């Protein structure tokens, strides 16, 4: 492990400017551009993937819906959910997309194990599950060998908006969160710190280096 991944902790950020910044970063990066991980939360929003079907949006109500360029179907983001955007040069790493997804899932499973939560991945539905309930969602886009979008881990949030959709296109999919599964207290900042460490280790980086500056500098 020799590479360094830069980490931006962006706080609560509207979805649209974050998505636009991901597109800019991915479009402008060169062969030597270091990889980055963005950790943040979003105000309430539904995002619909490229293959998203309208029938999976049951009754969005007053929550905005954004059509985006990631894989997968509709999902929900809201405060108390930890979102991680993985801006990686997948081609440079020599990692296949399936391997990338597996390593992200392993990062989440190991993080949850640290809270005595037994979680697993499913071959038929990307993401991480506790029993039959989904606790983390994945959705990536690869463009010219570079990834963007990423993961969303339910930490301590209002899960009710998930009832307005078929999460990730699965009718009746039950959602859960770390707060409801962990045996002890859950601090959002600590979960964020553990996630960055797990992702760096599982993806083969020697160091996760904090970057200053928000997306307006990108």
From Swiss-Prot:
Main location: cytoplasm
Pathway annotation from the record: Protein modification; protein lipoylation via endogenous pathway; protein N(6)-(lipoyl)lysine from octanoyl-[acyl-carrier-protein]: step 1/2
Gene Ontology biological-process entries: protein modification process
Residue span, BPL/LPL catalytic domain: 31-207
Pfam families to which the protein is assigned, alphabetical: LplA-B_cat (PF21948)
Residues the record lists as binding substrate: 70-77, 137-139, 150-152
Reaction(s) the record says it catalyses: octanoyl-[ACP] + L-lysyl-[protein] = N(6)-octanoyl-L-lysyl-[protein] + holo-[ACP] + H(+)
Entry-linked InterPro entries: aa-tRNA-synth_II/BPL/LPL (IPR045864), BPL_LPL_catalytic (IPR004143), Octanoyltransferase (IPR000544), Octanoyltransferase_CS (IPR020605)
Source organism, top-level taxon: Bacteria
Function: Catalyzes the transfer of endogenously produced octanoic acid from octanoyl-acyl-carrier-protein onto the lipoyl domains of lipoate-dependent enzymes. Lipoyl-ACP can also act as a substrate although octanoyl-ACP is likely to be the physiological substrate.
UniProt name for this protein: Octanoyltransferase
Native species: Azotobacter vinelandii (strain DJ / ATCC BAA-1303)
Lineage: Bacteria, Pseudomonadati, Pseudomonadota, Gammaproteobacteria, Pseudomonadales
Gene (UniProt): lipB
């Amino acid at each position: 492990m020799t590479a360094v991944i830069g980490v931006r902790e962006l706080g609560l950020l509207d979805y649209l400017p974050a998505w636009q910044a991901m597109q800019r970063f991915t479009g402008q990066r060169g062969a030597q551009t270091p990889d980055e991980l963005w950790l943040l939360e979003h105000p309430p929003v539904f995002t619909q993937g490229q293959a998203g079907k309208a029938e999976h949006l049951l009754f969005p109500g007053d929550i905005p819906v954004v059509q985006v360029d990631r894989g997968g179907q509709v999902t929900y983001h809201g405060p108390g959910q930890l979102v991680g955007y993985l801006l990686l040069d997948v081609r440079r790493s020599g990692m296949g997309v399936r391997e990338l997804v597996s390593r992200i899932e392993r990062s989440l499973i190991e993080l949850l194990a640290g809270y005595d939560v037994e979680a697993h991945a499913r071959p038929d539905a990307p993401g991480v599950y506790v029993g039959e309930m989904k606790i983390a969602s994945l959705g990536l886009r690869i463009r010219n060998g570079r990834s963007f979008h990423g993961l969303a881990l339910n930490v301590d949030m209002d899960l009710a908006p998930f009832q307005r959709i078929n999460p990730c296109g699965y009718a009746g999919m039950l959602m859960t969160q770390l707060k409801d599964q962990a045996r002890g207290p859950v601090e959002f900042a600590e979960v964020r710190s553990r996630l960055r460490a797990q992702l760096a280790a599982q993806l083969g980086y020697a160091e996760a280096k904090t970057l200053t500056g928000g997306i307006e500098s990108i």
